[in-house]
Amino acid sequence: MNKGIERSVSVVLGAQWGDEGKGKLVDLLSESSTVVCRCQGGNNAGHTVVAGGKEYFFHLLPSGIINPNVLAIIGNGVVVNLEALFQEINEAVNKGLLDVASRLRISDRCHLVFPLHQEIDRMEEELRGLNLLGTTKKGIGPAYSSKVTRNGLRVCDLIGDWDQFTAKYKELVNYVKRRYPALEINVEESLEQLKTYREMLSGMVCDSVLLINKLTESKQTKILVEGAQSCMLDIDFGTYPHVTSSNCSIGGVCTGLGLSPSRVGSVYGVIKAYTTRVGSGPFPTELLDGIGEYIQKKGNEWGVTTKRMRRIGWLDTVVIRYAHIINDFNALALTKIDVLDGLKEVKIARAYVDPETGNELSSFPADPFILSRVVVIYETLPGWKASTQNCRVYDELPPAAKTFIETVEKLLNIPIRWIGTGASRDSIIIRSV
């Protein structure tokens, strides 16, 4: 046993169905970090950070790269669309971020997302007819499928022997064309583009497993891992089949970076003051009335990646307790409380009941049919008319808003350390809990 091990890694994870505002907490914590990492997912993720009057949208890059002093690492668990990556780098540079390419390291073990994966994603969704999963059509699922069927190509293949890469790429094309005869792929054109990306990757690719584990040995190094998507979209623990294709919970951090669990010091969960989800799937607290419409408009609830309108529901502590069982959060960040300003009353889901037996469910149901039928038991609290927007101190909040926060804490038995009160990076309350 290594008794001198440093628990220098902090992790930020979503505890709902994504879009919780993880970027805001990552932006804050990255100020005291030396390294920021992505561990899973691809450019189906979407993190938004507002800083210096500019709005930054991140899909593949760790959003903590906004801090000019950090090293950013894309870990082995991420699937990388190179066209999207370089486009994102250019957009970040054009908005004034410094030395983005020179501060970025990409794992040589990352699997690659090709246009053929995106086409397969689109075709598969069309084949589902009315039973849509709500995929982002970014090719993420098919890329992970290639990884699991062991015919995927990795960054190390692309930067290695070109003839070998060409042969492997053609094998992959032949494999998918046998299954999708309608798929049109210009192999030579694709290879020419990939050769360009191969040159552009120069200096960025590394053995990220070795790099990260060496970095954890230093007491001066503070590593921040930002999860993409969220626990309820986890391929194993989410509301399957309406999930993403990777592990978005704490296990995905370790496997997606080659990091021992013993290196992880703190795990922080991020929740909204209400709940949202994009695409299909059961949603027990969903609001299909004027209140839902009010929250949707006021919260500007549109997907960063998909541009689709997000579905709206009340805060669901059953979901968050389940996420806590899996991830063991040290503390929570509660975002967008300002969106609830002006409501006559606010509700918090505290339990699910089986509609046939009338019994409270003892665990979060794996079966989506059961989840779609549950009766939700709510705590109903008075709303508040006074604005919480841009509050910086807890005691500045209206009494009813504080009651809401403290009720959530009591129901979850997890401290809420951060409270988001607006879009700006400075619109946050930090509590000593």
Swiss-Prot record:
Its cofactor is Mg(2+). IMP binds at D19, E20, G21, K22, N44, A45, G46, H47, T136, R150, Q229, T244, R308. One of its GO terms (biological process) is 'de novo' AMP biosynthetic process. InterPro entries: Adenylosuccin_syn_GTP-bd, Adenylosuccin_syn_Lys_AS, Adenylosuccinate_synth_dom1, Adenylosuccinate_synth_dom2, Adenylosuccinate_synth_dom3, Adenylosuccinate_synthetase, P-loop_NTPase. It catalyses: IMP + L-aspartate + GTP = N(6)-(1,2-dicarboxyethyl)-AMP + GDP + phosphate + 2 H(+). Binds 1 Mg(2+) ion per subunit. It is found in: Cytoplasm. Substrate binds at V304, T305, T306, K307, R308, M309, R310. It is an enzyme of class 6 (ligase). The active site is at D19, H47. Homodimer. Plays an important role in the de novo pathway and in the salvage pathway of purine nucleotide biosynthesis. Catalyzes the first committed step in the biosynthesis of AMP from IMP. This is Adenylosuccinate synthetase.
